[in-house]
Swiss-Prot record:
Protein's UniProt name: Relaxin-3
Propeptide residue range(s): 55-118
SUPFAM superfamilies the record matches: Insulin-like (SSF56994)
UniProt KW keywords: Cleavage on pair of basic residues, Disulfide bond, Hormone, Secreted, Signal
Signal peptide region: 1-25
Species of the source: Pan troglodytes (Chimpanzee)
Disulfide linkage: C35-C129, C47-C142, C128-C133
Function recorded in the entry: May play a role in neuropeptide signaling processes. Ligand for LGR7, RXFP3 and RXFP4.
Amino acid sequence: MARYKLLLLLAVWVLTGELWPGAEARAAPYGVRLCGREFIRAVIFTCGGSRWRRSDILAHEAMGDTFPDADADGDSLAGELDEAMGSSEWLALTKSPQAFYRGRPSWQGTPGALRGSRDVLAGLSSSCCKWGCSKSEISSLC
């Protein structure tokens, strides 16, 4: 009889949710679960999306002060460019696309050569989606 009461008490305890929230509470301090676009947005936010905007504004302000008379030289440079493109020297320097790409490795490259960083990203994104990850783990991708 005591066995049945113990089993009934255990069943009521599980059904009321006393067992499951405790397991979730232990996993919560690890990090936030991020999947798909949410993971990408978190990486961009963590790696300094606002710094890109700030550096763009600062670069624009610096260029405005550095090149005050660029418009005056623009017409003469455009004329020189037209002359150079019309000359036979320009045509001698150009190559066909086949000759240009012949000496370079193909876009495919050696199999697995550049996949290391992608594998790290894929591993972290899948673990962030399954178990969650902290901000310090996301910042390791920067």
